[in-house]
Amino acid sequence: MSDWSINDARTGYNVNYWSQGLYGISDTGEVTVSPDPSHPEYSIGLNELAKDMVKSGVALPVLIRFPQILHHRVNSVCQAFNQAIQKYEYQSDYLLVYPIKVNQQQTVVEEILASQVSKEVPQLGLEAGSKPELMAVLAMAQKASSVIICNGYKDVEYIRLALIGEKLGHKVYIVLEKLSELKIILEEAEKLGVTPRLGCRVRLAFQGKGKWQASGGEKSKFGLSASQVLTVIDSLKQSQMLDSLQLLHFHLGSQIANIRDIRQGVSEAGRFYCELQKLGANVKCFDVGGGLAVDYDGTRSQSSSSMNYGLTEYANNIVSVLTDLCNEYKEPMPRIISESGRFLTAHHAVLITDVIGTEAYKPEVIEEPETEAPQLLHNMWQSWSEVSGRADQRALIEIYHDCQSDLSEVHSLFALGQLSLSERAWAEQVNLRVCHELRDVMSPKYRFHRPIIDELNEKLADKFFVNFSLFQSLPDAWGIDQVFPIMPLSGLDKAPERRAVMLDITCDSDGTIDQYVDGQGIETTIPVPTWSAESPYLIGFFLVGAYQEILGDMHNLFGDTNSAVVRLDDDGRTNIESVLAGDTVADVLRYVNLDAVSFMRTYEELVNKHIQEAERANILEELQLGLKGYTYLEDFS
């Protein structure tokens, strides 16, 4: 297609929308990142960046982090709420809290905290949902506001550690997830001589919609019902500790796509807040939890991988609803807190890797079957003759269904021993040739052609064997059908000639990506340039900075990938910082309690027994290097 342009590529991969301006396609067809939005004139070509890393000894796949994106996301959220507070004359302030469960990597947490270093009054706190996370935030929270929110189920040790946090100078809010926690908190606080800051997670009747909707609603795993909240109030009054209840928390679920759901949830929780104030509580903080979505597919819709609102609209809705409620009840306006971890981290990381090979259909010359061949084969030849002779548009559909039916019968007859292997192979090739021709002559402008075109694209798609583990690097794509943007990193200045599916290198048929961003929709295949060993290109998986690393597992013992931090300086120069090596074979063996040292001793015994002396040293060296090597394939150079 000679009229192909870069704008066609940008539209086809929808990059202008899901990337939020952080990623793009250059005029030469290469994917770029602009990690510092304060300097949009500076960008980095991801293809060259990855190749430079490989030359310096960093094997693919590699996860690349852009910390300046983290800084930008933090400041964007704070700015949106600050502007909303000013717009609606809200009489309090805003605090952004990062739940470290989203990505606990030290680099990520420290860069998020660093985004507030220059602020006179930091607007950033940290959230922990377990004892290990609490131990981490106790050591890091002082770099921002020193506010810590403790969620999740708690035992005595967790509660004592949280209370000790107050002694260390932090402002620690212990959120009640169940009634039994209150008694323990009050007892341990008295022992330690600490006045606790309590929060209460309320279980709303309203439930948002999405993949994580079970986090909200009356059947939620966490939170207190209305009657349980009243029990907490009564218990605190009896203990003369009602002033300790300082935070109200609710959570609709992660990735809330519809702004109406957010508005309705805030409205119900706001009523809880106002009623608690009427009962004598002194709640100072209103924590809306998570839910601020990421537009993974760029469709700006209510799909589970998108969002039908922007950051400004999100902040405006929360602030305006609370303003109206507090004015209605004549209650003081609380500090607004949100826990927007996914929004902060998703965009900052991209996984780059190589294609190790492809399997592509190429039309073959097919001979007409012999006269004595089974009638079924002649029927299939007739279908091929009709489609190659350009049958009319409606006949094309009939030809397609006839050919699929005939192929199914061929397989049945082969299983019964009534067709030979060569006859089956011939039939399969004819079927592929018919499908290939149909895809070329059918048109999406005919509504009744569209579902068949989708089927044909999937049936004829190239298989790309990609050097990564879906289970390790994109577990949500496997586990919950999460959509992630995927693009070739180069060659996008020319019209894509193929459609493909991406398969990982695990020995599992589930290691296949089933959904791809394609224009303003989701398809089961992705348009790509022709790939060959002589002209290979790299693949980028985008928006993988939230949850994927910590949720990833070691299926087939593929471990953590190499990673690197990349930053632009003020002059637009690219600096590759803190390269972190991925897991070695010995590392992953150790995770499953297999001892590489004892394996080496066994290898030595086997080598001495079976290998001639002249070869022993070389064989042992290769075995040792195998244990020290990367768990992924290392042929790309």
UniProtKB/Swiss-Prot annotation:
Short name of any one Pfam family annotated for the protein: Arg_decarb_HB
InterPro entries listed in its UniProt record = Ala_racemase/Decarboxylase_C, Arg_decarb_HB, Arg_decarbox_C, Arg_decrbxlase, De-COase2_N, Orn/DAP/Arg_de-COase, PLP-binding_barrel
**EC number(s) on record?**
4.1.1.19
Q: Which residues carry this modification: N6-(pyridoxal phosphate)lysine?
A: K101
Q: What class of enzyme is it?
A: lyase
Q: Which cofactor does it need?
A: Mg(2+); pyridoxal 5'-phosphate
Would the keyword Metal-binding be found if you checked this record's keyword annotation?
Answer: yes
Query: Which biological process, per GO, is one annotated for this protein?
Result: arginine catabolic process
Q: In which pathway does it act?
A: Amine and polyamine biosynthesis; agmatine biosynthesis; agmatine from L-arginine: step 1/1
Tell me the domain of life. Answer: Bacteria
Q: Which UniProt keywords apply?
A: Decarboxylase, Lyase, Magnesium, Metal-binding, Polyamine biosynthesis, Pyridoxal phosphate, Spermidine biosynthesis
Regions that span the bilayer: none
GO MF entry, a single one: metal ion binding
Instruction: List the catalytic activities from the record.
Output: L-arginine + H(+) = agmatine + CO2
Entry binding sites for substrate: F286, D287, V288, G289, G290, G291, L292, A293, V294, D295, Y296
**Known function:** Catalyzes the biosynthesis of agmatine from arginine.
Assigned protein family: Belongs to the Orn/Lys/Arg decarboxylase class-II family. SpeA subfamily.
Quote the protein name from its UniProt record: Biosynthetic arginine decarboxylase
